[in-house]
């Protein structure tokens, strides 16, 4: 059980080594886990000398990211095949001799390699890193074609006892009621592809993470979200 989360925001000026907002957390084992807000749904995690990238893309919304300037990945996780989540060029730039690529079934087909995880699968990446693939899909009328049930993944990462939920592209699906004990959650909020702000609030109230990072939000106005989530530390970073 996590009894305490310590976090600090580090801002680094554009043009220096790291121009991205960072949040640092202490794990129960006394190590540090750092999140870098790259762009849209792309997240970089650093932990105990390991580099983990979630849905890295080289271009999104007018932003360009040069992954050749970043360390090679130990692990790359891809939620699904849409272009704002799956980018072959980004994967190639980040791939080194020991990189492990974890994807949903469709992305493995498109890329030609990768360790496949379907909803419900679990994978031990290291002694202190476990991943569970969870459902991510649309439920609203007129949206189900964007992310059909059973195709895409969200991921729950357990890193040295710290539990992180990366939701992927999803709405506030019933399966969220089964997601317990989350320390840090990344929930999407843009229309028509993921959640409305109201759905985001509902999902956060269901999951009850200690810390919530809205992401994948485009031009969505999130100014009223934090006030509706008493007891949850809502942090809005520059993903767009």
Which residue stretches match the model-derived regions?
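Bacterial N-terminal signal peptides
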Residues: 2-12
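Metallo-beta-lactamase
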Residues: 17-30, 38, 103-162, 235-240
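Pre-active-site segment of Zn-dependent metallo-hydrolases
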Residues: 20-30, 38, 42-81, 88-92, ...
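Active-site neighborhood of phospho(di)ester-bond hydrolases with catalytic His/Asp-centered motifs
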Residues: 54-56, 73-84, 101-105, 165-168, ...
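Active-site environment of divalent metal-dependent phosphoester hydrolases
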Residues: 59-62, 82-86, 108-110, 121-124, ...
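Active-site HxH/HxHxD metal-binding segment of metal-dependent hydrolases
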Residues: 64-123
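Binuclear metal-ion centers of metallo-dependent hydrolases, dominated by the metallo-beta-lactamase
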Residues: 113-125, 129, 201, 205-240
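Active-site-proximal loop/helix segments of hydrolase catalytic cores
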Residues: 138-206, 218
